[in-house]
């Protein structure tokens, strides 16, 4: 991750990594539980609108923004962080500021689309770089049916935002 990454960022990334391969994708899936949520894996009806899976029965898990919220809550060990990180991709976008790729750090959020996408977006967390300098992201992917790690650009992430709750000063403010 690098030597200049704050402890808060490392804790959020560590929490995010703890779910890789363990939690399935569930449209509208959220959790503010500190630790593993006992409801993960139980069969639930997808009640959120806007997906082909809406109305179907699936193993409960997280969607992309729910994963980001859970990782932040668990990184800080504070359920109150839900308000700071936001609910849903559009809220998470709004609660984060612009940061250039050169100034981005592990722990910053990445989005596939800009603000015009509203809630029709996808979000992940930057977690490091490849040997060739490309960003790596951890995210909860519907196409991979769960939490996965991979090259950010290959996963169509194009926008980087610094969450306002980080106390470092490398991001340009909106």
Q: Which residues make up each language-model segment?
A:
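...with weaker cross-activation on analogous glycine-rich loops/strands in unrelated enzymes
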Residues: 69, 74-149
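Surface-exposed beta-strand edges and their flanking turn/coil or helix-capping segments
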Residues: 40, 127, 150-154, 172-174
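Intrinsically disordered regions, especially transient/low-confidence alpha-helical propensity segments
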Residues: 24, 37, 67, 90, ...
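N-terminal capping segments
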Residues: 1-65, 69, 74, 173
